[in-house]
Amino acid sequence: MKILFAGTPKPAAIVLEHLLTDPRLEVLGVITQPDARRGRGRSLHPSPVAEVAEGAGLKVHKWHSLGASSEDAAAVRETLAAYREAGATAVAVVAYGNLIPADLLDAVEHGWVNLHYSLLPRWRGAAPVQAAIAAGDQETGATIFRIEQGLDTGPMLSKKAYEIGIRETAEEVLIELTNSGKSLLADTLVELGEGSATPQPQPEEGATHAPKLHPADARIDFSAPAKVIQRRARAHTPAPGAWCTLDGQRYKFGLMLPVAEGEEFPELAPGQLWADKTRVLVGTGDTPLLVETIQPPGKKMMRAADWARGQQELLAQSPRFDIEEDTAK
């Protein structure tokens, strides 16, 4: 089966690498975002997908937009028509980053076939993995569906569930879903080509939305229950990074865990820090949390216990992270 591929970030590049090794599929070309400025020098770099595609000798198209009124409009439509003539029957999509205009949805026989990181219709949108963890979902998964005009509303072609571990971060779940989703996408594309795939419309019942994340969404309010805080920290690791302020300085948090059953700890106000030789605890709206990793201002993420050993003067003052009622004053 001949296909095109559209994607941009590292997870999409991993999927592309898998599709390129599948003897049942032939990738004719790749669509990705234009080169972007990264790093300290702010020099232009190709997307991870572009790097994989160029390394494989594939033609790469770096259009700014697919819209009919964009400067690339004519080139986009002429190129897709040429690929269709060459036998491409589907566009595999993984985190491409641009909207697919209505007039291009049927540019090839089987349309644009997307790998989405949730069990649709739950968590439609840009941040499904983070939303699932923050909500306390015990299960998520990957869904392959055909793109239509609505946001992640198209008919589903296949699904695969994944159980979320109680310590797993968004990064870790994303890796697992990429690894399972790449095979699911390949198999589904082959089924489409063979005519054995059975599209299923998405029910509206149970539909939820996961909008794009912003740094403000990752702010921790330590007056919330411990389980809510712990989920938020896992959901926003590594990016944008769960954070809170102490004396006007921003600290980021990695893994935070509930204290073990029967473990002794002092009574702590929400946001209050406490440490002994082996533990760093922070107060919440109910039971304290054990802080495993922390990123102080201007530093890298480190073990909280190591950080605390150099902060005896600070900890002796019973410091307290800001909570929402403090910052609202």
Swiss-Prot record:
Source organism per UniProt = Corynebacterium urealyticum (strain ATCC 43042 / DSM 7109)
Function description: Attaches a formyl group to the free amino group of methionyl-tRNA(fMet). The formyl group appears to play a dual role in the initiator identity of N-formylmethionyl-tRNA by promoting its recognition by IF2 and preventing the misappropriation of this tRNA by the elongation apparatus.
Annotated TM spans: none
Which UniProt keyword terms apply here? Protein biosynthesis, Transferase
Can you say what this protein is called? Methionyl-tRNA formyltransferase
Query: Which positions bind (6S)-5,6,7,8-tetrahydrofolate?
Result: 118-121
* Family per similarity comment: Belongs to the Fmt family.
Gene3D superfamilies referenced in this protein's UniProt entry, alphabetically? 3.40.50.12230
Q: Supply the enzyme class, top level.
A: transferase
